[in-house]
Amino acid sequence: MSKKVTEEQNDGADGHREVLEKYDAESRFRVFTNKNITILISVIAVGFALYHLYTSALGAPATLKHRSIHVAIVLCLIFLLYPVKRSASRTKLPWYDVILALISLSTAGYILVDYIEIINRGGIPNNLDIIFGFILMVLVLEAARRMTGWALPILAVLFFFYALFGRAFSGIFKHRGYEWDMVINQLYVTTEGIYGTAIGVSATYIFLFILFGAVLGRSGMGQFFNDIALAIAGHTKGGPAKVAVLASGFLGSINGSAIANVVTTGTFTIPLMRRVGYKRNFSGAVEATASVGGQILPPVMGAAAFIMAEVLGIPYSTVALAAILPAGLYYLGVITQIHLRASKEGLEGMKRSEIPKVSDVMKEKGHLILPLLFLIYMLFFSGKTIIFAAFWTIVVTVLVAQVRKTTRMAVKDLLGALEDGARSALSVAIACAAVGIIVGVATLTGFGLKLANGIILIGGESLFLTLVFTMIACIVLGMGLPSIPTYIITSTMAAPALVQLGIQPFVAHMFVFYFGLFANLTPPVALAAFAAAGISGGD
């Protein structure tokens, strides 16, 4: 790669942390001055990753036990790593967060110790069930607030009160109301609440694929995506914008976060777009649009596809194959718009001397494609389970990275990848746990069906109008939320309306998933657009 482009990458990276911290709560973690605390947290995170590798290879404990362990360690790490508010010190660990971390572990400890009795009680909670259940719910809400902001916890609290005071509502949303102990029981000691399907997928598929992404990142795959996109499209008309589309699509499919994707690739691509003449607003818009689209691009699709497959009871390959055409059309539309804008404004590509050659990029890091090809084979053609595919893809990635010196990972790098994976999984896992409160209440009260009936009533049983109202509902429900909770909420609340009108469940779920993601681009929240504007200087 040319020296000039490399310098631009380094300059863009200087603002990386500042932009991430402004728009992504996940990046506001503590950096301790006390080395002993740092080592302790690293040990917990690495142990967490090793636990998931072990269970994926040799089998997990009983469902409730496995999910409770997953949630407890997630909560523990969040309270140790993330301060109670943005202005709090990030170099010291306050005593109250240590206590919260220990209490978090006790919520799983209780289930592990009393598991047989919990099963034998058959859904009739005792006092300890209620106490630990309430504690867990409060901890999940607070951890979700620290990681994702206020939107998801507030929505979860509203649903909790809806379960308690359903009699106070009128019309189709009225229900008989449920006692406190019944609601807590639904959320804690069953697999329909906090320990429901969402956290189950987080504790199995999602964690492993995030860990896979972390190992790829340590091997230099992110830089490879940027370089190969630059080599392929950098010299074409309006090239840097097309580079943004390709790089963001590649990376977004794996990392699952639109904001992180914007910042990771945008700090490199947006300055390049500005240099060839694209305006600030257009540069930011291209990066935001491309980054959001990565979550509908196979093979990983930001991990949401795995939840869809689990909820619908269909093979993952069915979801990924069905997503190829709409994802292709999405990116074709973006690239076409870029090309037309470049032609209109007379924007040329970069000079050949400023960009790397495809052959040079492939020679240096082309072998990193092999783990992705292996993953595609395992998911689509081998007939093996997703967990099996994810585990062995991680192993293959480590082995392939050792082939060349430029990507070789020492033991320190491997441990760093395990820690990176565990940390990166926190935001997804806690979002899934918080969404479990919403889904648990919706299941208990029948809220999803009630909302579906309301949408159909407003649409007058017209499929077109129902699609329009469902689209609006998905965009509203997805505002300010990560992609995975967005899909879970929209599939629970909005998809049933489409199914009642005769649309196949899979088609309905894909519809709500796509439009839920577009909340990242839709005012007034538009978090991906805000992050891109922070880099481009647009408005």
What residues fall within each predicted segment?
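Conserved, well-structured core domains of diverse proteins
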Residues: 1-120, 130-134
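Transmembrane alpha-helix boundary signature
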Residues: 85-89, 109-123, 147, 167-180
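Core transmembrane alpha-helical segments of multi-pass membrane transporters/permeases
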Residues: 142, 146-147, 157-172, 180-223, ...
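Hydrophobic mid-bilayer segments of alpha-helices in multi-pass membrane transport proteins
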Residues: 41-46, 66-79, 96-105, 130-139, ...
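Membrane-interfacial loop-to-helix junctions in multi-pass transporters
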Residues: 127-131, 192-205, 231-245, 276-282, ...
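Hydrophobic transmembrane alpha-helices that form the pore/transport pathway of multi-pass ion
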Residues: 226-294, 300, 304, 313, ...
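Long, contiguous bundles of hydrophobic transmembrane helices that form the permeation core
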Residues: 2-39, 45, 321-424, 529-539
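Long hydrophobic segments that form regular secondary structure
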Residues: 362-510, 514-522, 537-539
